[in-house]
Design a protein with these regions (language model features):
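Sensory coupling linkers of modular signal transduction proteins
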Residues: 3, 113-138
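Sensory modules in modular signal-transduction proteins
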Residues: 4-32, 38
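Terminal output helix/cap of sensory domains in signal transduction proteins
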Residues: 12, 51-96
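Short, acidic, Ser/Thr-enriched surface-loop or helix-capping motifs
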Residues: 28, 67-68, 99, 115-116
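Sensory helix hotspots in PAS and closely related PAS-like folds
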Residues: 41-42
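Beta-strand residues that line the small-molecule/cofactor-binding core
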Residues: 75, 104-106, 122
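PAS-family sensory domains
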Residues: 79, 108-112, 126
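PAS/PAC sensory module
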Residues: 91-95, 106-109, 124
């Protein structure tokens, strides 16, 4: 986020997630990728500097979400879409492409809208792989 005039919540969000051990990313109000932290880079197999900012459709195509068969799924009713549309936190589970080898893994995702009075600045999203042993239990 090198633009001269970044909204304060996005600057604060970037400062917060930079130090998190939990994989996290920031988006703009349209869901475009603005930044992800080192923990996310480790899971994705690429640094933010290698990936850069991406429109929502492009980063969804590269990283997911995908269904159980690996087909892309619409993002509108997943946590990020819900958080941006409804202005409230949202959580869900789906598959994403992790690591440079293209492996699809199930992740748990929480999305928090970044709101100012009368407008959205974007969203903060945290995610983590679902442990395979845990996914088989009830």
């Amino acid at each position: 986020m090198s633009d001269e005039h970044q909204p304060l919540l996005l600057v604060q969000g970037r400062n917060l997630i930079t130090g998190l051990a939990l994989p996290a990313l920031l988006t703009d109000p349209d869901g475009g990728l603005l930044f992800f932290n080192d923990a996310a880079a480790e899971l994705l197999g690429r640094t933010f500097e290698e990936v850069g900012r991406l429109p929502r459709e492009e980063w969804a195509r590269r990283f997911g979400p995908f269904d159980e068969e690996g087909r892309p799924i619409a993002t509108d009713h997943l946590p990020l879409g819900n958080a941006l549309r409804e202005g409230r936190p949202a959580q869900g589970r789906f598959r994403v492409r992790l690591a440079a080898n293209g492996e699809l893994r199930e992740v748990e995702v929480s999305a928090l809208p970044l709101l100012e009075p009368d407008h959205y600045e974007g969203a903060l999203v945290v995610f983590w792989p679902v442990e395979e042993a845990a996914s088989g239990t009830t």
